[in-house]
Amino acid sequence: MSIPPESVIPSLHESVADAPSAEQRQWAMFAHLSALLGAILTGAFGGGWGCFIGPLVIWLIKKDTMPFVNDQGKEALNFNITVAIAFVVLFLLTVMTLGIGLIITIPLWIIIGICWLVFTIIAAIKANEGVRYRYPFTLRLIK
């Protein structure tokens, strides 16, 4: 018993029909890039409240009308909340060790900040290409 090839591989017409529109791709890219804008405006790269306000606003406005923006907005929001949690934990470690923890926390803050910047830019590029990007090491708090 053999399976016809057209039942295994989706046709080009089906894959194009499922692709997000240019408008959805653009809004999804804005959801990711708004975290960068929030970081610039608040001066808190990676862990500040400004980093998740932009993705939250875009997600809340577009989630019901644009499925791709719903997915990528949640992803951007979850990633920025995860990074903020990591920064709070590092801050608490510093406070609890009366500053001695800075030996560990400063390099970790730098590494997490650089990773945040790189992953955010990659996500924006992928969203603009219509790819559903998943950030690594992200807590999926908003489903």
Model-derived features: where do they sit?
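Low-complexity, intrinsically disordered extramembrane tails and loops of integral membrane proteins
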Residues: 1-24, 140-143
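Intrinsically disordered, low-complexity boundary segments flanking structured domains
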Residues: 15, 46, 124-128
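Membrane interfacial helix-start motif at the N-side
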Residues: 16-22, 26, 34-38, 65-80
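Residues at secondary-structure transition points
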Residues: 21-24, 47-51, 63, 67, ...
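Hydrophobic alpha-helical transmembrane segments in multi-pass membrane proteins
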Residues: 28-53, 78-120
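Hydrophobic transmembrane alpha-helices of multi-pass, membrane-embedded glycosylation machinery
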Residues: 54-59
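Amphipathic, cytosolic membrane-interfacial segments at TM-TM junctions
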Residues: 61-84, 125-135
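A generic hydrophobic-segment detector
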Residues: 117-143
